[in-house]
Amino acid sequence: MTQLFPGPIVRTPGLAELDARARDIFRRVVESYLETGEPVGSRTISKGGVALSPASIRNTMQDLAQLGLLDAPHTSAGRMPTHAGLRMFVDGFLEVGDVAEQEKRAIEARLAVKGRSFEEALAEASSILSGLAGGAGIVVTPVREGGVKHVEFVPLGGGQVLAVMVFEDGQVENRLMRQAPGVTPSALQEASNFLNARLRGRTLTEARTEMGGELDAARRQLNETAARLVEDGLAAWSGGEGDARSLIVRGQANLLADARAREDIDRVRQLFDDLEQKGQLIGLLDDVRDAEGVRIYIGAETRLFSLSGSSVIAAPYMTGRQKVLGAIGVIGPARLNYARVIPLVDYTARVLGRMMDG
């Protein structure tokens, strides 16, 4: 089920190069660290039923540290796995089970709610993963291939306007925009008519490519308010960049829940900065689109998350005909519960794909 991203450039030993004692102690250290988030001392290992003295365990842990698999924080005599050590553990020791039946039913029920727009369903999938996995849920929306059928601007009051785009395949995308109070119904209708005349039948990518020159025409032909609606609507639907896809992130607050020390707070702040890099994140998840099953990125294996030391677990979601639509996953600290999160991501991606078919 799991296809893994290659390890870091710096060479680390393989499992075959570790003797049985080293493998056993290494596994116990990593499992304890993933459970508690705390460095693991030799006495903790000896209490777990290992028939070795604490001194022998310390010597083995020192050997593992010299191999680049374990490290010691400055404030503790205990050891914790390096990112290379976590990679070895995930590839060689991790036992991945199945999602609990109760959680399967909960995922299916929350994604089966009728009346949602396409993007609202994707946002719900991101929220589901965030809540179950304890990290931030991420989804990259598909590239829209269907043409636009209808565009409308709906006033909501309080300086807010809902931009509604209906596609030929029946999907609907909504964007909430802020406008100066007092936008008139005539300006909303004028902007809608202008876009409908030019966007009908075009994909979002085509619209963004071809509408750049039309904005000047909009400014000449429409009043100032209607022209601004046209410009803001196009920017909102296309994400404001050259890529017509959107990145949906939910559950960032979960990333703060596990922060214990100043170093953890700094790491989370860096991760928040990383999550603002939409283009790089979509580029990373594009690699996931080409994978079979779940991909795992740990810390420095990606340039984007090397400073925050975060991990990404993601999978493509696709139609029953194996057409890849996008990618969905979880971002969190390197000590994510991989055995739990991997099957959650895999199952949610498959349910989401079935829902897109329906």
From Swiss-Prot:
Keywords: Repressor, Stress response, Transcription, Transcription regulation. It holds the Pfam family HrcA. It comes from the Bacteria. InterPro entries: GAF-like_dom_sf, HrcA, HrcA_C, WH-like_DNA-bd_sf, WH_DNA-bd_sf, WHTH_transcript_rep_HrcA_IDD. Belongs to the HrcA family. Negative regulator of class I heat shock genes (grpE-dnaK-dnaJ and groELS operons). Prevents heat-shock induction of these operons. This is Heat-inducible transcription repressor HrcA. It comes from Caulobacter vibrioides (strain NA1000 / CB15N). The gene is hrcA.
